[in-house]
Amino acid sequence: MPEFGKEEIANLTKVVESGVFCDKRGGFMDQFRADFSQALEAKHAIAGATAMLLMHAIPGAIGAGAGDEIIVDPVVQFHAIACLHNNVIPVWADVRPESFLMDPESVKRKITKRTKAIWVTHLWGFPAEVDTLRQIADEHGLYLLEDCAHALMTRYRGRYLGNWGHFGTFSFNMGKQLPTGEGGMAITNDDRLAFELNRRIIFGESPEVLSSNYRMTEFQAAVGVAQLKRVPGYLEIFRAGKAILDESLAGCSWLDRRGEPPDSQISPYFWSCLFHGERRGVEWGVLRAAMEQSGGGFQFGFTQKPGYLYEMFRKPNAYGNKGCPYNCHLYTGKVDWRPGMCPVSEDVIPRIVMTNNMALREEEYHSKAARLKEAIKLAEKGEVKPLEYTELDRRILKAIKEQGPLEPLEVIEIFDREGWGHFDEHTMYGRMSALRSYYPYKLSHAGPRKFAYHDLS
């Protein structure tokens, strides 16, 4: 958890006493913008209520709209959602297997006459190859946009992330490296782009362009001014914690530490490694069960699949069920997102092992490292206890065994019909995933969200 103290309280008190909670000339938002741009060595900093809202406004600021494409990476999908909000088609480029970051060679293959920009994610505080991506963007007359939500004060080849592209966006929600509750900041070194973004996020009675009201409040900025001073100290602790977690993999040949780009100083957000159990004959489910047995604290497989396989992207229903924006008459391309489009992402994402890398106490990192070491030992020795089935598990297995591959909603319908109780889709999917992923893995995948009975006995 972040630290909050006397300066945050004093700043918030000043806001309350001023009686002006937003748009205060010379107030905390003006100070926060100035301090942030100076800290990141950028010319302009534009504050918003959230980073996502700033991302929503950026395609319009660069002139992207109906008929255009923006190339994105598929491990997360926030930039792709921002594209759809602007009637822009996100086009998915693959990632590097060792870093999970956008692959410039894949980007080159995705560029068309419709491409307007490249939007790269610095996933979990690791810098993507923005020098190469900027070169590609310049060669093709494209904008380079950076999602730096996880990568505050991350340097790559001597320059802070966010400054390699035409825009860089940063998130200040409670789970980020500079928490203000909610909030975001965009940086740019281009006067025209700063003007275009500003007029899309704050307007009065007569806006000149399609705009909204995405202001940051004085309360958020007051906390941000104080928290910005704490960030270097936070990052020092996070980097030391990452080193402790990295060391826990010493001697393990089947969990690969994530590749760290040369000439960079990362800002750890999530720590991660990649599962290669086939090198030692260790099953994925066995590691998960071993981790639970040793105390847990790690997530397995992240979202399980790349963004383009999410239902919301596969169906053209961004605006009701009108077929927009994929079937827009201004769009001359074809949307056909299906498995196999980004093979590296599809292979890597389900094999990611990860945990939060933003604890402020060193003992928390040592505890996690010890649990991971113990899980590795249990998995290698085969000393893993099988998953203990609940009544819910037994009924799920019965339904799928008797009625064939099923999706969570289909299992819920059977439960309702049989009077076995009603469960929401999230809970049902979680239990079905556990039965697939934990020893003795009674289910297997039969589709993106479909499970089949898989008896290994």
Task: Walk through the language-model features, giving the residues of each.
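N-terminal "arm"/small-domain region of PLP-dependent enzymes with the aminotransferase-like
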Residues: 1-22, 354-355
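Phosphate-binding glycine-rich loop
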Residues: 22-69, 82-86, 92, 159
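PLP-dependent aminotransferase class I/II
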Residues: 30-34, 42-45, 105, 117-121, ...
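PLP-dependent aminotransferase-like
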Residues: 60-139, 143-148, 155
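Conserved active-site segment immediately N-terminal to the catalytic lysine
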Residues: 146-178, 205-208
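Active-site PLP attachment segment
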Residues: 163-198, 218-221
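Short capping segments at the starts of secondary-structure elements
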Residues: 401-409
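Charged low-complexity interaction tracts in eukaryotic proteins
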Residues: 423, 429-457
